[in-house]
A protein has these predicted regions:
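Extended, low-polarity transmembrane helix blocks
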Residues: 1-112, 119-178
Length: 178
């Protein structure tokens, strides 16, 4: 037996392929989930009292510091970051209703497909949907000439395609057919 197709003796299972798929599936799932969650994050500035480093107590003068903290809330949601959205709004090849729908659905779709992938619920379907989302994001970035982002998304599309090829090694899933 060669190392490329190393099977457990007599089981017919390619554990290397299974482990490769699990690692890639895990990475793509975590990437999608956290990217979707980040769509609900924003920075808020709060004031905190200045702490005297020598005593560890609040400064007696009452001096305050502005500190940025990250908070997550439904009201913070922005599927497409404002600077990109401002550029995309003026793009004639991107209809406004499509941009609005994509902006509203991107975060929840990333979280949903990421969770599906992580749990093994419709693994192939969730990978395919993620691939379509990355293609749609690529179209937008091409239109506003964000070539670095296009290259990064190309890598994501390649990873999704590779995961779809490895899906035959998906041994740990709740719904294997999809």
């Amino acid at each position: 037996m060669n190392d490329m197709n190393e099977n457990e003796e007599g089981t017919g299972r390619d554990w290397g392929g299974t482990m490769a798929f699990l690692v890639l599936r895990g990475w793509l799932a975590v990437r999608a989930i956290l990217t979707g969650i980040e769509k609900f994050g924003a920075y808020k500035t709060i004031q905190k009292p200045l702490i005297d480093p020598a005593t560890g107590m609040e400064d007696p003068s009452g001096a305050m510091l502005d500190v940025k903290v990250k908070v997550y809330a439904l009201t913070n949601y922005a599927g497409i970051p404002a600077p990109l959205r401002d550029k995309l709004v003026n793009e004639p090849l991107l209809p406004h209703p499509v941009l609005t729908a994509f902006d509203h659905l991107l975060g929840p779709a990333l979280i949903l497909t990421g969770m599906m992938l992580l749990l093994g619920l419709g693994t192939r379907a969730s990978l395919f949907l993620q691939g379509l989302m990355y293609i749609a994001l690529t179209v937008g970035l091409i239109l506003i000439r964000q070539d670095d982002g296009v290259a990064w998304l190309g890598i994501h599309v390649a990873l999704v395609a590779f995961a779809l090829m490895l899906a035959k090694h998906n041994k740990f899933a709740l719904l294997k057919k999809w």
